[in-house]
A protein has these predicted regions:
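Short, well-ordered beta-strand core segments
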Residues: 1, 128-129, 146
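Conserved catalytic-core segment of nucleotide-activated headgroup transferases in glycan assembly
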Residues: 18-98
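Short, aromatic/basic amphipathic alpha-helical patches
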Residues: 5-10, 68, 90-102, 159
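Short beta-alpha junction loops
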Residues: 1, 81-86, 151-154
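Catalytic binding pocket for nucleotide-activated donors in carbohydrate/polymer assembly enzymes
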Residues: 10-13, 18, 134-167
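Short, conserved active-site loop motifs that form the nucleotide-linked donor/cofactor pocket
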Residues: 16, 75, 107-110, 164-165
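Donor nucleotide-activated moiety binding/catalytic core segment of transferases
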Residues: 90-137
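Active-site and donor-binding regions of nucleotide-sugar-utilizing enzymes
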Residues: 1-31, 136
Length: 167
């Protein structure tokens, strides 16, 4: 051992290393639960069960597809879009267009502000519908199942590609 100890690859180091997923710290945070309860009250949800639509990308009227499929069910439809920077104005425009098209037309449709934490939305829902978003992995931390829709197009390439699960 003494002959090899000077080689950096075999010399053990002592130290403290932090591991984990920073968002997992919020799962048991009472502030997230309190905020979710506050938002539930504020939105005055109609039903006991909530389905969260939280895609990576809003593209090709996916929100419209989701709403048409879920609206007839006796569930709350929660929409939580990602908070995009101005560099992605086309995506922001898609989000705004979908909201303008649907908001106020369904008594079981609720929009969660893009600046709200996704963790709050996950605490509020019973199931998640998404494309290839990491939100599906984050939902597991809340013991919430996810449905990955794999035939939705993702516009991060030219031409747009099909979503890929796992992420």
């Amino acid at each position: 051992w003494e002959q090899c100890a000077c080689i950096k690859y075999v010399n053990p180091r002592c130290g403290t290393y932090e591991f984990g997923y920073p968002k997992s710290d919020t799962v048991n945070d009472t502030k997230v639960c309190e905020r979710a309860n506050q938002l539930r009250e504020q939105l005055n949800l109609k039903y006991d069960v909530s389905v969260l639509y939280a895609p990576s990308w809003e593209y090709a009227d996916k929100e419209d597809d989701f709403i048409k499929a879920v609206a007839p069910l006796k569930v709350n439809m929660l929409i939580k879009q990602a908070h995009w920077s101005k560099e992605y104005q086309a995506i922001i425009d898609n989000i705004d267009e979908m909201r303008a098209q649907h908001e106020g037309r369904y008594d079981n449709l609720y929009y969660i502000d893009v600046t709200e934490s996704i963790m709050t939305a996950l605490d509020m829902c019973d199931i998640v519908v998404s494309d290839e978003s990491s939100v599906m992995s984050e939902a597991l931390m809340f013991d919430k199942p996810s449905i990955a829709v794999t035939d939705w197009l993702i516009p991060d390439t030219e031409p747009a590609r099909l979503s890929c699960v796992p992420m």
